[in-house]
Amino acid sequence: KKKIRILEPSVGIGNFIPLLVEKYEDKDEVIFDLVDIDNNSFVVLKNILDKLKLPKKFKFNFINADFLTHNFNVKYDIIVGNPPYKKLTNNQELLSLYKFNARNNETNNLFSFFIEKAISLGNFVSLIVPKSLINSPEFNITREILKEQNLLKICDYGEKGFKGVKIETISFLLETSIKKQSESIVIESYITETVEEKRKDYLLSDKFPYWLLYRNEEFDEISEKMKFDIFNSFRDRQITKQITKENGKYRVLKSRNVGNNEVKELENYDCYIDDTENLAVAKFLNRDDVVMIPNLTYYPRASFLPKNTITDGSVALLTLKNGSRLPTERDLEYYGTKEFERFYRVARNYGTRSLNIDNNSVFFFGLLKDID
C-alpha cells in the first residue's frame, strides 16, 4: 500500500514514532492517529516532532482521550504501542465500562482491554505487554482471543525491554483480517538470544495450561515421565509480620524453611502464631499429604507440611484435586533434581519474576508414572 494509517493507542511521548517513520519512509502518505489520556504528553511530543522536521507526507492527528472509551470509525492498517500495565482498582464505574466492552472480564489489568480493542480496530497489531500474558490464569481468555488471530511472532525481552524497570515484557505481532492461519510462529528471545520458527500447535498446545515458547524435545521426554494436573495451589494473603511473633502455638513456615523433603530450622528467621481462627490457611493445619513448595523460585523443592505448622504467602500449598494417588517422598525428591529444574525453566518460559505458583503453573508439578 502506498498510503497507510497507523494508530498508537497510548502514545506517551512517542518513543515508537522515529522507528515507524524510518520503516515507512517509502510510502506516499502515512497518517498517524496518536491517542493519549494525558494532554501533557502531547506538549512534549509536539516539541519532539517539530525538532524531527519530518517530510509533509507524515501527518499527525492528536487525540486526547481514553482509548478504551473513545469511538473510532476507521480501520487501521497498523496498531502499535505500549499500553499501560496497571490494575484499575479505584474506579469501579469505569472498570465496569471497560469490562462491558471486553471478552476477558476476569482481569482488572488495562493492557488486556487494550489488546482486545486494538484487535477490533487494526489489520496488523503489535503491542509490548507484560510477560504474564503468556501464563497467568487471569489472561486465559486473552490468550484464546490472540490464538483466534493469525499470530505471526512473539518476542520475549525478559527484563531487557525497558532500562531500569524490573518487569518482564514480551511483544506480539498478529494479523486480524486473514482467513487462513499460518501454521508456524516466529519466537525471538533476548533471553536465549535465538530466533526460531516453530509450529503453533506445538508451542500453543491445548495439552498445557498456557503457551510454552521454549518447548523442546528434552521437555517432552521429561513430560512423558509424569502425570500432570494433579494439584490445586493455595497461597496465604493474610499473614504479615504484624501478626507473627518469635514463639507461639503454631510455627509459620516461609520459603527458606522448605528443603528437599525436609523443613529447616533457621536462626532469626522462624516465626510463630497463636490464633489461626480467621486465617484461610488454617484449613490446611494438621492435614495429611499437603505439599509445600517455595513460591517465587527457579529451584523447586518440596516437602510435606508438618503437624502444627502453617505457611505464609512465600510458600504454595498443594493439595490433590482429582482422585490421583497420594504423592510420595520420591515424587517430592524429584522436584529437587537438576532434571526437573531444567524442565521447570521451560515450563515457566525462562521467567524471572512471573514465577507465582498459581492454578495454571501448578499443573507442571506432576507425579511420576513409575510409582503405582
Residue positions per predicted region:
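Flexible, charged surface loops at secondary-structure boundaries
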Residues: K1, F72-K75, S120, T244-N247, ...
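Conserved hydrophobic residues forming the short capping helix/wall of the S-adenosyl-L-methionine
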Residues: Y24, L49, K53
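Conserved Rossmann-like nucleotide-binding pocket used by diverse enzymes
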Residues: L7, D33, I63
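Conserved class I S-adenosyl-L-methionine
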Residues: K3-S10
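Polybasic, glycine- and aromatic-enriched phosphate-binding surface used to engage nucleic acids
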Residues: E217-D372
